[in-house]
A protein has these predicted regions:
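Membrane-interface helix-boundary motifs at transmembrane edges
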Residues: 30-43, 91-102, 167-177, 191-203, ...
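Interfacial "cap-and-anchor" motif at the non-cytosolic start of specific transmembrane alpha-helices
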Residues: 9, 13, 180, 187, ...
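Membrane-embedded alpha-helical segments in integral membrane proteins
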Residues: 1-2, 24-30, 53-62, 216-222
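Individual alpha-helical transmembrane segments in multi-pass integral membrane proteins
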Residues: 9-23, 36-132, 140-157, 211, ...
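Short, strongly hydrophobic alpha-helical membrane anchors
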Residues: 1-10
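Alpha-helical transmembrane segments in multipass membrane proteins, preferentially the mid-helix core
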Residues: 25-29, 85-92, 152-177, 181, ...
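Hydrophobic alpha-helical transmembrane segments
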Residues: 29-33, 91-92, 114-118, 218-226
């Protein structure tokens, strides 16, 4: 952290670039390894959004003919997509139709995306944001920062609650199945307990783990130093790779079908 500033900054450009490469490779891996499905599409979009944010952080000092402000807007656009995509993924894993909550999350996402892309002064990225080992961009408007924080944490916690609720429901179904197995003295466990439900539980648990790894460190930083709320995206960038690892390493194998099957 800069002693002369209340902002917490991202890791070095080298770390940003390595993370971008990993997340991009993970998205490509999912495309070529798994059969097309809604879950695969959502996982790929999440990974692409994470990678896009990393490259925006890496380029925020200006590159490829675009200004730092352009890259900052692009970065905010990318990270704003994460909450609705994550909630939608949780619904798909659970086998539930995307309802009012998911649609509302996308509508609020579009509202913030339009704000960050088209409203002047919605994002700050100037010469003072560029350092030898880090870069940062943030929202200078206090009211917008509060609303964006509410949007971000609100939908993330909605997704967490939904995952937990679905795990509880599916677990009850499995427990009832085991009870029926005992009472009937049947040895056909696979006919009573749906293996698909077990995979759903594991996938949802890993998704919760990814959310916690993504949210908890940022939340702790915000609690310790509330002024860092304005730089939430720059703080999250250091932990985004944990979510990417969870998606490609643990959620995808339990929810997607291999192409060579």
């Amino acid at each position: 952290m800069n002693k002369k500033s209340s902002r917490l900054y991202c890791f070095s450009p080298t770390v940003m670039l390595i993370t971008f490469i990993f997340e991009s490779f993970s998205a490509a891996f999912a495309i070529f390894k798994y059969k097309s499905s809604k879950i695969r599409t959502l996982i790929i979009l999440l990974l692409i959004s994470l990678a896009s944010f990393q490259i925006a952080e890496f380029m925020v000092c200006g590159a490829w003919g675009f200004s730092g402000m352009d890259w900052a807007r692009f970065g905010y656009l990318a990270i704003t997509l994460l909450p609705p995509l994550g909630l939608n993924l949780a619904y798909e894993i659970s086998g539930k139709k995307a309802g009012v909550l998911v649609k509302t999350s996308y509508l609020t996402c579009v509202a913030f995306a339009v704000y960050f892309v088209f409203v002047s002064g919605s994002v700050f990225a100037g010469d003072n944001t560029c350092r030898a080992n880090y870069s940062v961009f943030n929202t200078p408007n206090g009211a917008a920062t509060f609303l964006y924080t509410l949007y971000y944490y609100g939908w993330l916690f909605v997704a967490l609650f939904f995952c937990w609720n679905q795990i509880s429901k599916i677990s009850k179904e499995i427990n009832h199945g085991i009870l029926r197995l005992i009472l009937s003295r049947s040895k056909r466990l696979n006919m009573i307990i749906n293996g698909e439900n077990l995979r759903k539980i594991l996938a949802l648990k890993w998704l919760i783990g990814g959310y916690v790894a993504f949210i908890m460190p940022t939340t702790i930083v915000n609690i310790v130093n509330p002024s860092t709320i304005e730089g939430i995206p720059s703080i999250m960038c250091g932990f985004a790779v944990l979510m990417a690892i969870t998606l490609i390493g643990f959620v995808a194998p339990r929810t997607l079908e291999l192409k060579n099957k």
